[in-house]
Swiss-Prot record:
ATP binds at residues 30-37. It is found in: Cytoplasm. This is DNA replication and repair protein RecF. The RecF protein is involved in DNA metabolism; it is required for DNA replication and normal SOS inducibility. RecF binds preferentially to single-stranded, linear DNA. It also seems to bind ATP. It comes from Salmonella paratyphi A (strain AKU_12601). PROSITE patterns: RECF_1 (PS00617), RECF_2 (PS00618).
Length: 357
């Protein structure tokens, strides 16, 4: 899938925009604060239901407006479809696909698999485990049809179990929740383990190309002890969980550890090297999806030139072109991206929320 057209209304500093897009590279050039990142964020929001710079919908709605509206035309192999998202200040969303309402945001996410590379994206490597769980869960969501339902049910049951921990005095009182929770936890952990194993070679190969000076290793940790039954862990941990008033073990505590030469990457790599690693991981994940399903990602890259020298920018550009995917790149100057441009790409200039090509 690729976006052929994007309409933006009352999103951040953009009052109205109607963009005809290239199926290849689309460049957004403008000064800081011009609105170029807002275009990337609008695309991301259309596919995720939320912005990547703010979780509060009111902050991305243009000043003194009640809602934002995003609309896109998606070109697939066989046909084109329309998608739309409206969200108001209260956070209420309306999703429309091919002219019909009542759809879920998860449907948009499935239609528009995206990889996001931003200056804030270092959290994948130096942030908490939740960011690396999200990396694995993106892959599971796009590779396992039942993942989203299982993951949603797991979140619901954990919330209910944690609330119950404040009220119960004996473990037997928790069994109704654990009876449902245990098979879900084991299934999600199995999916994550299988995905991390399947993509490991792709990640290793891509990382070797981007960071040949390091030996990188990847390890999945499921959130409770190896070779231990989750049911036993929950029962054994009851008193501690009750004291903490939350469930201390499970797939919600999983991690995906990345090491360079045996040490955590956040302690070993420079900022430039961390950005290269982040790019390599996102590329590997997108390429794995294409190979396994035939579907291509949209790549969103904010502030392309930051942290990368000319050689590394050239390497990233060549790898992105090889994916034959649709790519959106923001930059302060056209000079930073002109070498990536070809006859099929489009260059947009962004100034004070106005976009021209």
């Amino acid at each position: 899938m690729s976006l052929t057209r994007l309409l933006i209304k009352d999103f951040r500093n953009i009052e109205n925009a109607d963009l005809a897009l290239s199926p290849g590279f689309n460049f957004l050039v403008g000064a800081n604060g011009s609105g170029k990142t807002s275009v990337l964020e609008a695309i991301y929001t259309l596919g995720h239901g939320r912005a990547f710079r703010s979780l509060q919908p009111g902050r991305v709605i243009r000043h003194e407006q009640e809602a934002f509206v995003l609309h896109g035309r998606l070109q697939g192999e066989e046909r084109e479809m329309s998608i739309g998202l409206t969200k108001d200040k209260q956070g209420d969303s309306k999703v429309r696909i091919d002219g019909t309402d009542g759809h879920k945001i998860a449907e948009l996410a499935h239609l528009m698999p995206m990889q996001l590379i931003t200056p804030e994206g270092f959290t994948l490597l130096n942030g908490g485990p939740k960011y690396r769980r999200a990396f694995l869960d993106w892959g599971c969501f796009h590779n396992e049809a039942g993942f989203f339902t299982a993951w949603s049910n797991l979140k619901r049951l954990l919330k209910q179990r944690n609330a119950a921990l404040r009220q119960v005095s004996r473990y037997e009182q928790l069994r109704p929740w654990d009876k449902e929770l245990i098979p879900l936890a084991e299934q999600i952990s199995t999916w994550r383990a299988e995905y991390s194993s399947a993509i490991a070679q792709d990640m290793a190969d891509t990382c070797q190309q981007f960071l040949p000076e390091f030996s990188l290793t990847f390890s999945f940790q499921r959130g409770w002890e190896k070779e231990t039954d989750y049911a036993d862990v929950l029962e054994r941990s009851f008193e501690r969980d009750r004291m903490l008033t939350y469930t201390a073990h499970g797939p919600h505590k999983a991690d995906f550890r990345i090491r360079a030469d045996g040490a955590p990457v956040e302690d070993t790599l420079s900022r430039g090297q961390l950005k290269l690693l982040m790019c390599a991981l996102r590329l590997a994940q997108g390429e794995f999806l294409t190979r396994e399903s035939g579907r291509r990602c949209l790549y969103l890259i904010d502030d392309f030139a930051s942290e990368l020298d000319d050689a590394r920018r050239g390497l990233l550009a060549s790898r992105l072109k090889a994916t034959q995917s649709q790519v959106f790149v923001s930059a302060i100057s056209a000079e930073h991206v002109i070498d990536m441009s070809d006859e099929n790409s489009k260059m947009f200039t962004v100034e004070k929320g106005k976009i021209t090509d």
